[in-house]
Amino acid sequence: MRHRKSGRQLNRNSSHRQAMFRNMAGSLVRHEIIKTTLPKAKELRRVVEPLITLAKTDSVANRRLAFARTRDNEIVAKLFNELGPRFASRAGGYTRILKCGFRAGDNAPMAYIELVDRAEPKAEAAAE
């Protein structure tokens, strides 16, 4: 029985799931928007939101915790130097999921997951 077991299995073993979400979290922090399937996007929220909350208070211990979860110094630097200060006044809810139709090959529901206060460089350039 799977009573009270949280999280989706996504037809992967635990090490594959952990590696996949570690990579996806890094991509989301790096690019601030990624396109993936809807169930993966909903699970990715559970990985990324605590990372950003951790980055709001900059300390060596928090940087080490973030590195243990992402294994990428570039991602840790962006979390603590850019995203932590950007979301300092926001109490959670750092990501947004936008549904974007279905994938052509297998009709899987697709979604964009993005950071809420994401800067849009194309819109700013067009306005000028």
Swiss-Prot record:
**What biological process terms from GO does the record include?**
translation
From which residue to which does any coiled coil extend? Answer: none
- Ranges that cross the membrane: none
Q: Which GO terms describe its cellular component?
A: cytosolic large ribosomal subunit
Q: Which domain of life is it from?
A: Bacteria
Sorted alphabetically, which keywords does the UniProt record give? Answer: Ribonucleoprotein, Ribosomal protein
Give the family from UniProt: Belongs to the bacterial ribosomal protein bL17 family.
> Which NCBIfam families does this UniProt record tie to the protein?
L17
- How does it associate, per the subunit comment? Part of the 50S ribosomal subunit. Contacts protein L32.
Q: Which HAMAP family match?
A: Ribosomal_bL17
Protein name stated in the entry: Large ribosomal subunit protein bL17
What is the species of this protein?
Answer: Klebsiella pneumoniae subsp. pneumoniae (strain ATCC 700721 / MGH 78578)
Q: What would be the name of the gene that encodes this protein?
A: rplQ
